[in-house]
Amino acid sequence: MSLKILIFYFLSSIFFLTNNIFASHVTVVDGDTIKLGDIKIRFSGIDAPEIKQTCIASEGKVACGKISKDTLIAKVTNNKISCTDEGKDVYGRVLGECFVNGESLSSYLVREGFAFAYRKYSNKYVQDEEYAKSNKLGMWSMEFEYPWDFRSNN
């Protein structure tokens, strides 16, 4: 009986390991996409401004897409990243949630106002977005266009 349990736990751990991606070298593509080696991972459930996207802050026009990317770069620099593999999107990118020291990067970006809950696909980050909005954090302190609207209009 104990051998069956041991085999079950062994096989379960192999299954869970194959659904995770680990790396210490990360390249930030934009505010919601990274590369771990050759694997491009799009954070599921969030949407960040496009690199060329701008917002209007009190000091004038700012590159909010670049700010979102730079925020992610600062968070992952010199840290080990782990990501879940949740399948692929229509562009062939791996969809997943990535973590630094156990903290979800998606949750962090949305809660700080540098990405939005992508309600079209998930409600997971809605509370984080409500927090950022009510505290006027990140893009919530500016005039902005949602990334999905920006893509449609440009």
Describe the predicted segments one by one.
Residues 2-154:
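Small beta-barrel nucleic-acid-binding modules, primarily SNase/OB-fold domains
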